[in-house]
Amino acid sequence: MWGRGFLQRARFAQLSPSSSSSRSLLSAASAAPPNLLYSHYQRGRWFGCSTANMAPVRDPNTLSNYDAWRTRHTTANLKIDFTAKCLRGSVILELESQTDKASKEIVLDSSYVTVNSIKLNSAPSLWETKARTEPNGSPVHIAVPEGAAKGEVVKVEIELATTDKCTALQWLTPAQTSDKAAPFMFSQCQAIHARSLFPCQDTPDVKSTYDFNITSPYVVVASGVPVPDETKDLGEEKLYKFQQKVPIPSYLFALSSGEIASAPVGKRSCVCTGPNELKASQWELEGDMDKFLEAAEKIVFPYRWGEYNVLVLPPSFPYGGMENPIFTFATPTIISGDKQNIDVIAHELAHSWSGNLVTSCSWEHFWLNEGWTMYLERRILASIHGGDAHFDFSAIRGWKALEEAIKEYGEDHEFTKLCISHKGIDPDDAFSTVPYEKGFHFVWSLDRLVGRENFDKFIPYYFGKWSNKSLDSYEFKDTFLEFFSAPEYSDLKDKIASIDWEGRFHSTGLPPKPEFDTSLADVCYELAEKWKSKDFTPSPSDVASWTGNQVLVFLNAVQDFEEPLTVEQSQALGKAYGLSESKNAELKAAYYHIAMRSKDASAYQGVADLLGEVGRMKFVRPLFRGLNKVDRELALKTFEKNREFYHPICRQMVEKDLGVSEAANSS
């Protein structure tokens, strides 16, 4: 056991990035064997000081000891280096002690980050990066020899640089952008990728306020409110500052930089995107942003984040949208020229309450974020479009997606549960429609059980009680039961007692199917029935008055035929309704699934072309799986051609879908 004197003489520990288990090098004792200070280290113990009596962490996807220390504020002083394709600089974490000097170390999550030095309260600190374990990365252990009194805040300053293995960042060359003039970068930290930007407590169970001080030669966007008065010109670069005063989890840390222009689209909103896309993006979104905000505020309570803006990213962005606060990061597939795909914005806006303000404590309870958000999204859209028929119409589409996801996994698969065990599981591997739609159906079932008028009173109560906090499924259950235990709801006692909470949380497969209002979908089903006859002659007028979503429901119904269309029918479908030439990626992708099921080889190259234009996983993964079944050679060729176009998260998932992970990793 090494005493205090030796510790005080040791100046700092430095990471050797080439080492699989990074070594601590002591400048005051360079002759000491590697890891000498850690030879007697055990988790929960530093120099004989036990933390065994502390409450356990409840997130299996973090290696941090956030039960002993909690990040309260984060300052990111980072330079965006487009030449080296990395972020470099320092991050300062202000951590509050949760014990009375019982913990003698801080443990942070990290993944493929080069750490150059760490200071504790401005003084060099002992630290070590431990060996990597999948899927959670390499924990960074920082000595706090004297511990800290309960409630005391310590500052940890980390000098660092990201590496080429960073899973949170995508770097685009000028050629990969529309105007071909400048490079572009953006981050995607959900689920556990913030740790590849900087060591942190990378768990949704910890929330921090943020200061962003970001230097770049191009415009910067971050998940905070811009502080334009403090932007500084540094010659070829500028320092951009943002503040996030509402505490957020690490997965909502977001950065983007490039040739970005902006335009107003509402009283509290602007759209940001490439200069070439600005006019089309502004047209697509203006007129709806204020409506979405006002509708959401009536359902929950006033928006607490100040601004609500949208950054429309290049095509390789892997999601429909990412609910980064202040600036939703959105796929360009929503800019379809017909305002048919902006439901995504209603969804991401709803996250301002469900997910961002009130957060699931771990990815095992992800449905609390997404199920609630689907519910709020549908309430928002129903209030704008005029009634429950629109709510049910969207829910019908969601049920179809849920059926497909569960069919893909299998009825008894762990990932078809609401509450999923994530021990040893990468949350990205468990990502699917299930937490969205199965979660929605649970929330909606509670709404129907107690009645809309009563449920509408519960909504602001729930979001008010858990604002700026994180919770698990059982805390949600307790909150629901607490609210409806009030005397005025005594007539609901028997109904509430009938809720099968355990079954809802832990049963695999589909939930009970509700009775949908099919009034907006019936016409779609009627047209689909006509396509079962090989003698049917289609006409563009069949769908001329329909919304894009009605066309999508029709296509989904055709896709479900027991007997696929013939090649001739498939080609007639694409031609008559203009699907293969559509600018709407939703419709185009749905049509290509029908064509592949029909074995229409003339459509396969169109599938490959679309896969080179869109990086959104909602389209990319199913299309690759479909193409792989009918033409594996083309699927592999298409993936290799576009490998660098896809975001690292998307690329990794497609590798698994195509069964090329091992080959790719060994090459």
Swiss-Prot record:
Reactions catalysed according to its record: an epoxide + H2O = an ethanediol
KW Protease (keyword) present: yes
Enzyme kind, highest EC tier: hydrolase
Annotated localization: Cytoplasm; Nucleus
GO molecular-function terms, A-Z: aminopeptidase activity; epoxide hydrolase activity; metallopeptidase activity; zinc ion binding
Active site as annotated: E348 (proton acceptor), Y436 (proton donor)
SMART domains: Leuk-A4-hydro_C (SM01263)
The record's free-text note on cofactor binding: Binds 1 zinc ion per subunit.
A biological process from GO: lipid metabolic process
InterPro entries linked to this entry: Aminopeptidase_N-like_N, Aminopeptidase_N-like_N_sf, ARM-type_fold, LTA4H, LTA4H_cat, M1_LTA-4_hydro/amino_C_sf, M1_LTA4H, Peptidase_M1
Keywords of the record: Cytoplasm, Hydrolase, Metal-binding, Metalloprotease, Nucleus, Protease, Zinc
Binding site for a peptide: Q188, C189, Q190, P318, Y319, G320, G321, M322, E323
Subcellular location, principal: cytoplasm
Cofactor: Zn(2+)
A Pfam family of this chain: Leuk-A4-hydro_C
EC number: 3.4.11.-, 3.3.2.10
GO cellular component: cytosol; fungal-type vacuole lumen; multivesicular body; nucleus; NVT complex
Binding site for Zn(2+): H347, H351, E370
Tagged with keyword Membrane: no
Family assignment from sequence similarity: Belongs to the peptidase M1 family.
Function: Aminopeptidase that preferentially cleaves di- and tripeptides. Also has low epoxide hydrolase activity (in vitro). Can hydrolyze the epoxide leukotriene LTA(4) but it forms preferentially 5,6-dihydroxy-7,9,11,14-eicosatetraenoic acid rather than the cytokine leukotriene B(4) as the product compared to the homologous mammalian enzyme (in vitro).
Name of the protein: Leucine aminopeptidase 2
Organism: Neurospora crassa (strain ATCC 24698 / 74-OR23-1A / CBS 708.71 / DSM 1257 / FGSC 987)
